[in-house]
Amino acid sequence: MSDLVLVLNCGSSSIKFALFDAGVQPPPRKPLWNGKVDGITGPAPTFGETGVTPGPVALDTAHPYNAALQYIRTRVLARMEQGGHHITAVAHRVVHGGAKYSDPVRVDAAVLADLRSYIPLAPLHQPFALEAIAALLESNPDLPQVACFDTAFHHTLPDVEKMLPLSWDAWERGLRRYGFHGLSYEFMSVALPERYGDAARGRTIVAHLGSGASLCAMQGLESVATTMGFSALDGLMMGTRCGSLDPGAVLYLMEIEKLSLEEVGQLLYHQSGLLGLSGVSSDPRALLPLEAENAQVEAALALYV
C-alpha cells in the first residue's frame, strides 16, 4: 500500500487533480495519475485523465461545481481501491493568502474563515478552492488539508514594490500589491538553477502566460517585482481581463455611462482583453488564423504582444 497526496487546483470552470507518491524523496514532480473536469459551468462538461481522451460527463446542472468535486472524489477513491493506496493529505492551490500567509498552512475551520475574507480580492478563483476545502472538511474532517498560496512567493517584494500610490492610511488598511501566480514562479525558482546553475540566481524575468498572465522579476531566486498587483486584473492584457488600466476609465464608465458596479466587474474580468477587443475569442491560438482577414482580431493581437 502506498501513501499518496492528492493535489487540487480548482478554477471557476475546471478542477484539475493529481496524485503524488508521498513516500518518495525528493518529492516527485511527475504525478502517478492526473486529470481534470473541464467546462463545469458550460453546456458540455468533460472529464479526462492520464491515458484517456477527455469525454462528456453528466453533472447536476443545479449544483455543477459540487457535482464535479463529487465525481472526482468517486473516481479517485475507485482508483485508490484498485491499487490498494491511501490518501494521507490533500494540497490545494489557493490564489490569495493576503499579507498573513507567507507559507503553506494546514486548513481548519478558523483558517478557512480567514481565507474567505480574501474572496473580494480574488473573486474568480478564491471561492472555488474554498468550496472544495469546505466539502472535504465536512466529509473527511480528519484528512489533513494544506493550502498553498499564489501570493506567498511575493512576500519577498520590497515594501516600495508592495505599495500603491494611494494614502498612507490605505496602505495601513491593507491596500497593497500582492502579486499572483506565485506557485508557478516558485517552481521556476527551483527548476532554473537545475538547468542554468548560478546564472539563474542573478537577475531573471519569468513569464506566466495563460488565460491569466503576469511577469515576475527575480533576484537571488526571490520575487523583487511583478506585474500583477492588488488583484489579478492588473498588469498584462489577458484573455478576458483588461490588465493595467487608467482608473479614470473606470470612473467614466460608472459616472458617465452609468454602468453598475456589477457591470463594471463583469466587463473588466470577463469581457475585456483578447475577447473584448477581438469579439471572437480569448485564445490567441483561435485568433492567429484570423489575423489577416479581421481588423479587430489584428488590433487585439497587436495590443496583446
Regions from the PLM with identified roles:
Residues 76-125, 144-146, 153-163:
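Short beta-strand-loop/turn "lid" adjacent to the catalytic site in phosphate-handling enzymes
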